[in-house]
Amino acid sequence: METIQPVTIERDDTRIEGATLGGALHGPVRIETEGRPVAMIRYTNGVLSGPATYFYPEGNPSAQVQYASGKLDGKALFYYPDGKIQREAHYAHGVLHGVSRTWLADGTLLEEAHYRNGKLHGVLQRFHPNGCLALRQPFNAGKPLEAAKRYTDDRRPLAADGKPLPRWKQWWQSLANPSSA
């Protein structure tokens, strides 16, 4: 029966502490540079498995993710250096699957996208820094279902030429097609 053996590897300023089972990393592994944590990860028989936390040089987490069979799997959080959430994404078997959101450093939502098996599936929305909708486009299995609808930061639709639609024209179109207003 094989036993778990502690292992420490040092090279220059980097130190890796963990354990091996049958010669493969097994269990929690801590990686440090100059005495500061770089990553805390977990292995099962040499394969990334379970929770992992990565750190900025200052010590704050830069990412908290989950692994299964060596691939990202589950909720992943990515942080700004000050600790605020920059991105939340969901993975299944190493590809995006589920809702993904990205925020600006001030906490304003910048993008919300839905994925299925690594492809956009559902509505993609992007926002201006003031929080107003900038783009909206539905997708099915990675393919756009219609052209993106784009908006100015004061909520006016953009015409095909990229210029804001005049308010009178926007009003007129809303009368002709109330469901698109």
Explain the meaning of each model-derived region.
Residues M1-A181:
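Glycine/tyrosine- and acidic-biased, solvent-exposed loop/turn segments at the edges of beta-strands
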